[in-house]
Amino acid sequence: MQVLAKENIKLNQTVSSKEEAIKLAGQTLIDNGYVTEDYISKMFEREETSSTFMGNFIAIPHGTEEAKSEVLHSGISIIQIPEGVEYGEGNTAKVVFGIAGKNNEHLDILSNIAIICSEEENIERLISAKSEEDLIAIFNEVN
């Protein structure tokens, strides 16, 4: 099972709240067999502890440490929100990465996302990508 599959990418989405964005990221992972139904509630638990907004229009919601048992396969969902969504404290997210990692694979996933998002040009490419293949290509450049 691929960590980032085409089915895990939702382009050009419109959501009305941070909660809706997190739910969509989690539901995408559920629908494609990466996590159990309970994972979304663990994502919200994690968000209550501290915001998963990373700056530069990027948010990376994920489950709590206890949520590891809900992860069936390591994976990423990418929700592209070109118009942005209020993500708390005046921050706007335009790309939301839902992540789930078996064992410690989430650290590798986070590392790849951090490398990609350290370049402002890559963030612009993520926000403006017109196809799932375009987004996957950005990730393949890092690996």
From Swiss-Prot:
List, from the UniProt record, the residues annotated as the active site of this protein.
H62
Q: Where in the cell is it found?
A: Cytoplasm
- Phosphohistidine PTM positions read H62
Biological function: The phosphoenolpyruvate-dependent sugar phosphotransferase system (sugar PTS), a major carbohydrate active transport system, catalyzes the phosphorylation of incoming sugar substrates concomitantly with their translocation across the cell membrane. The enzyme II CmtAB PTS system is involved in D-mannitol transport.
> How is this protein named in the record?
Mannitol-specific phosphotransferase enzyme IIA component
Query: Coiled coil: which residue ranges?
Result: none
GO terms for biological process, alphabetical: phosphoenolpyruvate-dependent sugar phosphotransferase system
Write out the GO MF terms.
Answer: kinase activity; protein-phosphocysteine-sugar phosphotransferase activity
Q: Give residues where Phosphoserine occurs.
A: S74
Query: Whose protein is this, by species?
Result: Bacillus subtilis (strain 168)
Q: Which UniProt keywords apply?
A: Cytoplasm, Kinase, Phosphoprotein, Phosphotransferase system, Sugar transport, Transferase, Transport
Q: What is the lineage of its organism?
A: Bacteria, Bacillati, Bacillota, Bacilli, Bacillales
